[in-house]
Curated annotation (Swiss-Prot):
Top-level taxon of the source organism: Eukaryota
Similarity section: Belongs to the ST7 family.
Keywords: Glycoprotein, Membrane, Phosphoprotein, Transmembrane, Transmembrane helix
GO cellular component: membrane
Chain segments annotated as transmembrane: 15-35, 62-82, 512-532
Xref: Pfam families: ST7
InterPro entries registered for this protein in UniProt: ST7 (IPR007311)
Membrane topology of this protein: Multi-pass membrane protein
Species annotation: Muntiacus reevesi (Reeves' muntjac)
Full protein name: Suppressor of tumorigenicity 7 protein
Phosphoserine found at: S386
Length: 585
């Protein structure tokens, strides 16, 4: 019985909604008919006469006051709408209309019927949004001592934010520490050093860790009863201490490379020892995992030092060997370093081979992957591309592929073209980036702008085609074309990652809703009319009468501004202006 009653109520509700949706004209005529039938009991004629008499007794000052009051209310609404839009990025009235009024009018029936089916899709989109708003370590990050600090010494500006450096400290604690560090004095010191906020305190702690390893431990071994022999044993070097000094104390890339080579000797020895003991327990396994991260980090930074010092082929070889030795450590994104080095060598065939492996639908994308693929496609046609010729004959297959690759890259990260086309100034890239955000665009363009300039016509092709992407995705926050909708969180995260002197690029740009613009125009227009009517009541009355005559005339289609002013002059009986006299000598 209960189920039957519930079904009947649902059917009744659906019938009512259907009637209001499709039969509103019938309801309207029914209401008019009832009003006509009840016109005598309701005294409609008397009430209309009373209202007409009241309106006839009103003075112009009442209408001026009414107009001023409406202008004031419209201004208050405008101010509130502008404040709400600046704070939340949407119109308050639009949000209320969509969220509360639309369900009452039956605009969400389809969604309610598919509620159970859409729950899984919502959860998937939420997970995707969270993954896209994740902050990643910049695979091409600079050296603090040799590059970031030198920029600070020259300009007096801090290129790194506290939030960015705090994320780096968390990464160092994750990669370079383990639970057994307290058993070794040097590692215990370094565990505290990674938590230090003061750079000088971190450097001092690294030196202290190295000094502890210089102390020799003596082990007394009795060989003869009458004498003893002292066996001298050196403690292993602390690789993480060398890493910290190379990153923060070295003022040149050459000095950093020397320190990383010392770190490689120490880290390689620790890695070999822990590799033999990794199966003896969870503690040894964690230590081996830490030593693996240390060794991979050192080799990657050594390859980057070689790339900075101009030994690009050596850097490519080191990166390839590292990727073969540790193929599962994709967290460091070494393939992006390899792509940049191969582009410097102009080894485009090797670049294409790397892209074929990593530009896969199952792997996370990046600006380096998408824009490098677009660069290779553009390289095939950019030297002969001409917008005029393309508009006459149309795009060829190769040109169409290049344009589609550019559109794909721009959809993934729409901030990059402004930096590649030098429409915005570059800054030093941060140590962490947000994929599809302004921080990733800066990190990519900082290293890859030279590669785009080297390919003849590539920037011209990008300049002619990149804005066409936005016509394909008019609502990027709601629906994408080749990727998921653009995440909303990029602006907030980029403001935390990028320094304050940089103007963060925002996509899509927040435009004022039409309701706010309409309210502003209506408010200004009514306020102006009220002011003119109060100051010049006779002139405004004549002007209004002339406007009514023009709108009601049969020749309204031929009206213009001159006819309006002629009618106003006729009403006011303004004499014509005297004609100028010409004198002859």
């Amino acid at each position: 019985m209960a189920e039957a009653g519930t079904g009947f109520l649902e059917q009744l509700k659906s019938c009512i909604v259907w009637s209001w949706t499709y039969l509103w004209t019938v309801w309207f005529f029914i209401v008019l008919f009832l009003v006509y039938i009840l016109r005598v009991p309701l005294k409609i004629n008397d009430n209309l006469s009373t209202v007409s008499m009241f309106l006839n007794t009103l003075t112009p000052k009442f209408y001026v006051a009414l107009t001023g009051t409406s202008s004031l209310i419209s201004g208050l609404i405008l101010i509130f709408e502008w404040w709400y839009f600046r704070k939340y990025g949407t119109s308050f009235i639009e949000q209320v209309s969509v969220s509360h009024l639309r369900p009452l009018l039956g605009g969400v029936d389809n969604n309610s019927s598919n509620n159970s089916n859409s729950s899984n899709g919502d959860s998937d989109s939420n997970r995707q949004s969270v993954s896209e708003c994740k902050v990643w370590r910049n695979p091409l990050n600079l050296f603090r001592g040799a590059e970031y600090n030198r920029y600070t010494w020259v300009t007096g500006r801090e290129p790194l934010t506290y939030y960015d450096m705090n994320l780096s400290a968390q990464d160092h604690q994750t990669f370079f520490t383990c639970d057994s560090d307290h058993l070794r004095p040097a590692d215990a010191i370094m565990q505290k050093a990674w938590r230090e906020r003061n750079p000088q305190a971190r450097i001092s702690a690294a030196h202290e860790a190295l000094e502890i390893n210089e102390i020799r431990s003596r082990v007394e071994v009795p060989l003869i009863a009458s004498s003893t022999i002292w066996e001298i044993k050196l403690l292993p070097k602390c690789a993480t201490a060398y890493i910290l000094l190379a990153e923060e104390e070295a003022t040149t890339i050459a000095e950093a490379e020397k320190l990383f080579k010392q770190a490689l000797k120490a880290g390689d020895g620790c890695y070999r020892r822990s590799q033999q003991l990794q199966h003896h327990g969870s503690q040894y396994e964690a230590q081996h995992r830490r030593d693996t991260n240390v060794l991979v980090y050192i080799k990657r930074r050594l390859a980057m030092c070689a790339r900075r010092l101009g030994r690009t082929r050596e850097a490519v070889k080191m990166m390839r060997d590292l990727m073969k030795e540790f193929p599962l450590l994709s967290m460091f994104n070494i393939h992006e370093n390899l792509l940049e080095a191969l582009l410097e060598l102009q080894a485009y065939a090797d670049v294409q081979a790397v892209l074929a492996k990593y530009d896969d639908i199952s792997l996370p994308k990046s600006a380096t992957i998408c824009y490098t693929a677009a660069l290779l496609k553009a390289r095939a046609v950019s030297d002969k591309f001409s917008p005029e010729a393309a508009s006459r004959r149309g795009l060829s297959t190769a040109e169409m592929n290049a344009v589609e690759a550019i559109h794909r890259a721009v959809e993934f990260n729409p901030h990059v073209p402004k930096y590649l086309l030098e429409m915005k100034s570059l800054i030093l890239p941060p140590e962490h980036i947000l994929k599809r955000g302004d921080s990733e665009a800066i990190a990519y363009a900082f290293f890859h702008l030279a590669h785009w300039k080297r390919v003849e016509g590539a920037l011209n092709l990008l300049h002619c085609t990149w804005e066409g992407t936005f016509r394909m995705i008019p609502y990027p926050l709601e629906k994408g074309h080749l990727f998921y909708p653009y995440p909303i969180c990029t602006e907030t995260a980029d403001r935390e990652l990028l320094p304050s002197f940089h103007e963060v690029s925002v996509y899509p740009k927040k435009e004022l809703p039409f309701f706010i613009l309409f309210t502003a125009g209506l408010c200004s227009f009514t306020a102006m009319l009220a002011l003119l009517t109060h100051q010049f009541p006779e002139l405004m009355g004549v002007f209004a009468k002339a406007m009514i005559d023009i709108f009601c005339s049969a020749e309204f289609r031929d009206w213009n501004c001159e006819s309006i002013f002629m009618r106003v002059e006729d009403e006011l009986e303004i004499p014509p202006a005297p004609q100028s006299q010409h004198f002859q000598n």
